[in-house]
A protein has these predicted regions:
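Short, leucine-enriched amphipathic alpha-helices that occur as contiguous helical runs
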Residues: 15, 19-27
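Short, hydrophobic secondary-structure boundary micro-motifs
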Residues: 113-116, 156-157
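Helix-turn-helix
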Residues: 2, 21, 29-63, 67
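C-terminal peripheral helix-coil segments that are non-catalytic and often amphipathic
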Residues: 2-6, 142, 176, 180-237
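Short acidic, glycine/proline-enriched loop segments that cap or flank alpha-helices
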Residues: 154-165, 180-184
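Amphipathic alpha-helical packing segments from all-alpha helical-bundle domains
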Residues: 126-152, 161-173, 191, 197-202
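Hydrophobic alpha-helical connector segments
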Residues: 67, 81-114, 121, 131-135
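Short, basic, alpha-helical segments at the C-terminal edge of helix-turn-helix-like DNA-binding modules
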Residues: 70-77
Length: 237
């Protein structure tokens, strides 16, 4: 019984190693050749595995990219947890999470530029708003839900319900800026993060002011329309 469990564990570990090897090889080749010029056969050959084995772990190049999305999210989540446990203010929590997102993505900066050429297509399954990206998108929004829920900030209930989604959109905008940032050590990106997080924190604080209620309601109505539009696009694709 023990030997059977040991054999199963060894097989699982070997499978994970093979899966990681295929993904790492694919990312390297996608960076070198671009998305269109990289084939599953070429990935398998360079990784030293059979084509059937490559397809066993990843059904297509799209599945490889979704695995990349998932891996970078998991890296970001692990990096963010200590900061979220330490900080209680919304500003400090948001600043840490957004900065750590860029920290964890930085090793893939050049590849991200190549990937963006395909992911920017609204009809591409690699688009962050696409149906195929829904699991990672939900997990990422969940991180922002935890960020908001455990903060000590006073946030109106209607804004609190939509804030995680809005912060997810904000962080996607930061990533887009980072992709195009050629400054040394992405200094412009980090400066943008510092300034915009401070601005967002002030705006969220102002949202509790009774005089801001009509403006807040109108803004949240636009968010609802945006969500409805996104849902329609996902269904259409």
């Amino acid at each position: 019984m023990k030997s059977a469990r040991k054999a199963a564990a060894t097989k699982t570990a070997k499978g994970e190693q093979t899966k990681t090897l295929i993904l790492s090889t694919a990312l390297e080749m996608l960076h070198e050749r671009g998305y269109e010029n990289t084939t599953m056969r070429a990935i398998a050959e360079k990784a030293g595995v059979s084509l059937g084995n490559a397809y066993h772990y990843f059904g297509s190049k799209d599945h490889l990219i979704q695995a990349f999305y998932h891996r970078t999210h998991e890296d970001h989540l692990r990096a963010s947890l200590p900061a979220l446990e330490k900080e209680s203010s919304l500003k400090a929590r948001l600043l840490a999470v957004i900065r750590l997102k860029i920290d964890t993505l930085e090793p893939y900066h050049e590849f991200a530029g190549v990937l963006f050429q395909t992911a920017a297509d609204p009809h591409s399954p690699l688009n962050p708003f696409a149906h195929a990206a829904a699991p990672v998108r939900r997990d990422s929004i969940k991180l922002f839900e935890d960020l908001v829920a455990s903060s000590k900030a006073r946030i109106p209930d209607d804004l609190r319900a939509e804030l995680p989604y809005l912060l997810w959109l904000y962080h996607m905008g930061i990533i887009l800026f980072w992709i195009h940032d050629t400054s040394r050590k992405r200094a412009r990106t980090y400066r943008l993060i510092d300034q915009t997080v401070d601005l967002l924190d002030k705006l969220i604080s102002l949202a509790s002011n009774p005089l801001m209620r009509p403006v807040r309601k109108r803004a949240l109505k636009l968010v609802t329309e945006l969500r409805d539009f996104e849902a329609e696009e996902v269904e259409a694709n």
